């Protein structure tokens, strides 16, 4: 039996395993640290909206809880935290 939490992303409620929540929280914190103060709020809102969209796609039919594997796959889709932020002139 696993402990689950309820989270709200982009005004959508999800049930998520405790270990999946910890992984997601660490990922979002790492991404946030890569962003400048000016872009942080908007970009984090966009990322949370995309995570919510991906969670919704994964939670079809009889699956009701986001697990660690779901979060790992979403992180793979979104990219590493180091890929966010930085000086756009360098790209």
Region locations from a protein language model:
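Soluble N-terminal domains of membrane-associated systems
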Residues: 1-91
């Amino acid at each position: 039996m696993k402990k689950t939490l309820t989270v709200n992303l982009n005004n959508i409620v999800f049930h998520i395993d405790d270990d999946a929540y910890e992984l997601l929280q660490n990922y979002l914190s790492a991404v946030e640290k890569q962003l400048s103060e000016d872009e942080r709020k908007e970009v984090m809102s966009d990322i949370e909206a995309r995570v919510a969209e991906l969670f919704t796609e994964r939670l079809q039919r009889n699956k009701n809880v986001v697990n660690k594997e779901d979060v790992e796959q979403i992180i793979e889709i979104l990219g590493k935290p180091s890929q966010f932020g930085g000086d756009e002139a360098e790209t």
